[in-house]
């Protein structure tokens, strides 16, 4: 499972798709989610605005499996 480190409280699923190179621009997020199954914490998700937080898992078949890591929490901050 690949780790995606964020330095904010959350990222949206649309931002995440761009971070993982599943899409080349943010404008493609809506199309991508309508054409491909994306699983967040084991459930199909189609909302590009879905907030992904520390320890959320994302599975994009054909692209990869990912876990969200909050940089602050990973460095010993409180959750």
Which role fits each region the language model picked out?
Residues 49-79:
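C-terminal structural segments of small proteins and small subunits
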Residues 1-11:
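A detector for short, charged/polar N-terminal pre-domain segments
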Residues 1-3, 35, 57-60:
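Low-complexity, intrinsically disordered short peptide segments enriched in small/polar/basic residues
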Residues 12-54:
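A basic, amphipathic helix-loop patch mediating RNA/tRNA/ribosome contacts
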Residues 9, 36, 64:
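A generic "binding-loop/recognition-motif" signal
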């Amino acid at each position: 499972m690949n780790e995606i480190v964020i330095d904010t409280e959350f990222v949206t699923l649309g931002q995440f798709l761009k971070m993982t190179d599943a899409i080349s621009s943010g404008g493609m997020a809506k199309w991508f989610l309508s054409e491909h199954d994306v699983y967040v914490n084991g459930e199909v998700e189609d909302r590009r605005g879905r907030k992904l937080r520390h320890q959320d898992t994302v599975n994009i078949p054909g692209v990869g499996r990912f876990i969200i890591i909050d940089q602050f929490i990973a460095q010993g901050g409180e959750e």
